[in-house]
Structure formats: C-alpha cells, structure tokens
C-alpha cells in the first residue's frame, strides 16, 4: 500500500495537505483545477518535491528521506523528454543506466519493453522520425525498463488526439495490470479517469481528498468537484 500520511507540501504561498491510502496495483486518477497541485503531489511522491511535514510510505517503509532514485517509483512527465540524438533503443536504455552501459540481460529488458509498447522494428529510429504516438510509446518504454512498483503519469498524453490518447491509456492499463503496478495519473479529463482509473483523488483549494470510486464520484460529485466539472 502507498500511504500519504498527513502530507503538508508548501511552495511559496502554495499549500497542499491531506492523507490518502492507495492499494497495491490500484489505478488512481488525480484530478482538480489547474494550479491545484496535482503535479506537485506526484513530484512529492517521487521525491522531487520536499515535504514540509508528513510521510510517504510504501508497504510500511518510510520513503520520505529517500532520494528519487532510491524510491520504487517511475515517473512519466508531460514532455516525454526523449533525447533527439539518441535512438529509441538508446532512449529506453537510459531508464536502466544514464551512461547506457548495459549488460546483456539489461539489453534484453530494453528489447522486451520496446516490443511491449509496439515499437518493434523501430529500435534504431530517432524521435524526429517517429509520430507523436510513437514518441509517447518510446517514453513509456523507458519507464517500463525501470521495473518499479509505482508508476506516476503527469499528463504525458495530453498533446495526443483523442484516439491516440485512448490507445495509450489502454496500453498503460494493460501493462500496469499485467505487472501489478500501482498507477497514479494526473488528468484534466474526467473521461480519462473513467477509462483507466478505479479510484479518483480530488485536489482542490489546498486539500488532498482520499481516493473514492471513480464512477460513483464523477456521477455524483461533491461540491468541491462539482464546480471543476461544471456540473
């Protein structure tokens, strides 16, 4: 279980607080108004944003003092951050070793991840030679090779059209289900939450609300969510 215990996150005048528990292998969408702190929450879980107070715990272990690389977390950002001078294979390999000095078993892991995201045969292409959807798949492959227990998605597919975005969300859901990965995904689109998430965490007015079942929450939103949805 991922436990966010009495979190208190502060950045200048910004403040976010709350407590939440997320079961292992659960899929959770994080929604709320722009600027509410959705991305900041993911950064705190990953270790990029320090906490003013509180704890991040995974399976009972306190991760709060751990550096990002020491946490069982992989994160995919809005910009996939592919290196333009590197091939798909080389970009994916960065998820294992920034120096790309891979052992044979690690190289096999890279090949398997590339195939799993549907880029088999495109290993030697560079990002400029890929479509937007293929670039998203390459970035996802780099995350997969890390083989972490928690996957954080900060709207990595926001720039894709509806059909491609749905395709990527379905792929993520398949992969996380296959591997028992806990997923947290920031989204501005309630339809994305319905498509991929079992539960929703609402962030609004400085408050982190505990997870609630997706369809029940979106079909009968509380006041804090109603304004955001325009319901």
UniProtKB/Swiss-Prot annotation:
Presence of keyword Transport: yes
Gene name of this polypeptide: thiQ
Residues annotated as binding ATP: 32-39
ABC transporter domain ranges (all copies): 2-230
One GO MF term: ATP hydrolysis activity
Family: Belongs to the ABC transporter superfamily. Thiamine importer (TC 3.A.1.19.1) family.
Protein name: Thiamine import ATP-binding protein ThiQ
A GO CC annotation given for this chain: plasma membrane
Annotated EC: 7.6.2.15
Signal peptide limits: none
Gene3D superfamilies referenced in this protein's UniProt entry, alphabetically: P-loop containing nucleotide triphosphate hydrolases
One Pfam family it belongs to: ABC_tran
């Amino acid at each position: 279980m991922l436990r966010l215990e009495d979190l208190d996150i502060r950045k200048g005048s910004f403040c976010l607080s709350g407590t939440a528990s997320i079961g292992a292998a659960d899929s959770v969408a994080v929604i709320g108004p722009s600027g509410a702190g959705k991305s900041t929450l993911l950064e705190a879980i990953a270790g990029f944003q320090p906490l003013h107070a509180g704890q991040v715990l995974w399976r009972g272990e306190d991760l709060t003092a751990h550096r990002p690389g020491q946490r069982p977390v992989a994160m995919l950002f809005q910009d996939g951050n592919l290196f333009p001078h590197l091939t798909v294979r080389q970009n994916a390999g960065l998820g294992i070793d920034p120096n790309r000095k891979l052992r044979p078993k690690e190289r096999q892991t890279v090949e398997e991840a590339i195939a799993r995201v549907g880029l088999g045969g495109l290993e030697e292409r560079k990002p400029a030679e890929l479509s937007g959807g293929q670039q998203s798949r390459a970035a996802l492959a780099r995350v997969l090779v890390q083989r972490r227990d928690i996957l954080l998605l900060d709207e990595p597919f926001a720039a894709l059209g509806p059909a491609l975005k749905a395709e990527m969300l379905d792929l993520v859901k398949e992969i996380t289900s296959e591997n028992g990965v806990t997923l947290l995904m920031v989204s501005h689109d309630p339809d994305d939450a319905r498509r991929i998430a079992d539960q929703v965490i609402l962030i609004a007015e400085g408050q982190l609300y505990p997870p609630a079942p997706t369809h029940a929450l979106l079909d009968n939103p509380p006041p804090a969510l109603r304004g955001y949805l325009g319901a």
